[in-house]
């Protein structure tokens, strides 16, 4: 007897993507999701629904749908960037709408020659990423382009942050700090290179219009292979890069382009689709198509005298064979690499609940590995130096998950009996020089 599920039945049982896109705001305090009939906004942690906007079909314009394919918030303000998407887009895919939720209307409209891939907002500028270019405008009722169009590789990764120059200066000069707008993107001319620029350094020529203004950029040779992903930290001092190979993650200084850290995700090739710095820049979270979440330690503490990270105290795990294989010409390079301090192989909690149904295991696994999520870090208002919890929001399954980074218990396997006054986790029993070990634990999850 054939007990296999019919192909048509398996196809019909596939879950439709819950969200068309997910994006966090500038400080990860909120995230927005795009839907086939509008968009929603949630508070990141604790998870609460803040806004739900539903668009209805137009009685006068039958060609106008309700789908929103992309959203981007401006901090926690009433301004939200919208791009059409879905089966019946509300707007064209090459049109950017700035929605004012306070006035309940569209306040700014920008049209382009190609589809919009990403949008970044600040109180000063609007940065629009297209298929092969970047266009930058003033944030005003009638937006004006502030510099020439920037060329990037097809579907190149771009990141943009607004920060204060005090993060790049000593305390003696912090009184004269100013606002910086750092943008990073892959070079269109040289493979493996990225360009970093500060929009506040745009130079205008009185004899030329603003569109011909010069934007000074610095070039960083990051990888040999094409750039896959570029991410800036919130302070604008570091930029993380990875190539299409997906084995190495490198972190550079945006100030002088020097290499700060190099981390190894793994040995085999992977598609890294998400990276995110922690609020104070001490850690970097990385996700690939293998659905393994890695946490890399960039530095441990901040030097309070200069307000700069202490990279000398950074730690990370090493390969188990590093201390057993002597250095030589035949020793693989990856043995000397710095690995993540902890990682977790992610699983969809809804699919896990149906593991007893063996007929659906393959379908569930395939759906999960095709799913993509965004990372947002949680920050304790009472202790802003503590970066130990983060949130994942999955696009297709609509799952919200919170993970925490915990120190592993150091147990002496040779000791099985303890006195009444002795704790199982006594810091005094920790061996001198023994590295601290960490683990990622899922604290909670919820279906949105």
Swiss-Prot record:
Top-level taxon in the UniProt lineage:
Eukaryota
Topology relative to the membrane: Peripheral membrane protein
Which SMART domains does the entry link to?
WD40 (SM00320)
Q: What's any one GO cellular component for it?
A: endosome
Which intervals of the chain form a coiled coil? none
Q: How is it modified after translation?
A: N-glycosylated.
Record-level Gene Ontology MF annotations? phosphatidylinositol-3,5-bisphosphate binding; phosphatidylinositol-3-phosphate binding; phosphatidylinositol-4-phosphate binding; phosphatidylinositol-5-phosphate binding; protein-macromolecule adaptor activity
Residues in WD repeats: 222-262, 267-306
Biological process (GO) annotations?
autophagy of mitochondrion; glycophagy; nucleophagy; pexophagy; piecemeal microautophagy of the nucleus; protein localization to phagophore assembly site
Give the subcellular location.
Answer: Endosome membrane; Prevacuolar compartment membrane
- Which residues, renumbered to this chain, are glycosylated? 61, 155, 256, 280, 315, 421
Purpose of the protein: Involved in piecemeal microautophagy of the nucleus (micronucleophagy).
* Sequence intervals crossing the membrane: none
User: What domain comment accompanies this record?
Assistant: Contains a beta-propeller domain involved in specific binding of phosphatidylinositol 3,5-bisphosphate.
Could you list this entry's UniProt keywords, alphabetically sorted: Endosome, Glycoprotein, Membrane, Repeat, WD repeat
Compositionally biased region (Basic and acidic residues)? 424-435
In Swiss-Prot or TrEMBL terms, this protein is called SVP1-like protein 2
Family, similarity comment:
Belongs to the WD repeat PROPPIN family.
Return the Pfam families for the record: PROPPIN (PF21032)
Task: List the residue ranges of the region (Disordered).
Answer: 416-435
């Amino acid at each position: 007897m054939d007990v296999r599920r019919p192909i048509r039945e398996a196809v019909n049982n596939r879950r439709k993507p819950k969200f068309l896109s997910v994006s966090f705001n500038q400080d990860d305090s909120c995230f927005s999701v795009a839907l086939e009939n509008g968009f929603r906004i949630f508070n990141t942690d604790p998870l609460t629904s803040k806004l739900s906007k539903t668009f209805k079909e137009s009685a006068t314009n039958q060609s106008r749908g309700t789908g929103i394919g992309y959203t981007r918030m401006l901090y926690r303000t009433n301004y939200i960037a919208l791009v059409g998407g879905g089966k019946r887009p509300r707007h064209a895919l090459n049109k950017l709408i700035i929605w004012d939720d306070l006035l309940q209307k569209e306040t700014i409209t920008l049209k382009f020659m190609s589809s919009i891939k990403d949008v970044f907002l600040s109180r000063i500028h609007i940065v629009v990423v297209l298929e092969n270019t970047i266009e930058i405008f003033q944030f005003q009722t009638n937006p004006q382009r502030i510099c020439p169009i920037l060329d990037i590789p097809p579907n190149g990764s771009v990141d943009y942050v607004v920060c204060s120059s005090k993060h790049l200066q000593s305390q003696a000069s912090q009184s004269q700090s100013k606002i910086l707008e750092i943008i990073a993107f892959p070079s269109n001319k040289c493979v493996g290179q990225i360009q970093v620029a500060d929009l506040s350094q745009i130079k205008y020529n009185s004899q030329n219009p603003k569109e011909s203004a010069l934007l000074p950029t610095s070039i960083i040779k990051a990888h040999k292979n094409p750039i896959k992903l570029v991410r800036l930290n919130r302070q604008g001092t570091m930029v993380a890069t990875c190539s299409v190979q997906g084995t190495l993650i490198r972190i550079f200084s945006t100030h002088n382009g020097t290499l700060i850290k190099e981390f190894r995700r793994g040995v085999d090739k992977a598609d890294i689709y998400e990276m995110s710095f922690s609020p104070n820049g001490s850690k970097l979270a990385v996700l690939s198509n293998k659905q393994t979440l890695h946490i890399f330690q960039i530095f441990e503490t901040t030097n309070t005298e200069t307000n700069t990270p202490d990279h000398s105290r950074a730690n990370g795990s090493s390969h188990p064979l590093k201390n057993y294989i002597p250095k030589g010409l035949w020793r693989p390079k990856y043995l000397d690499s710095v690995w993540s301090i902890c990682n977790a192989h992610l699983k969809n909690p809804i699919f896990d609940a149906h593991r007893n149904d063996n007929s659906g295991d393959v379908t569930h696994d395939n759906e999960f590995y095709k799913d993509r999520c965004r990372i947002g870090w949680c920050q304790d208002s009472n202790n802003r130096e503590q970066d130990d919890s983060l949130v994942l929001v999955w696009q297709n399954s609509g799952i919200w998950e919170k993970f925490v980074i915990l120190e592993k218990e150091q147990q002496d396997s040779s000791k099985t009996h303890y006195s009444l006054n002795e704790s199982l986790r006594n810091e005094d029993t920790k061996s001198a020089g023994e590295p601290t070990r960490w683990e990622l634990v899922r604290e909670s999850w919820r279906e949105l």
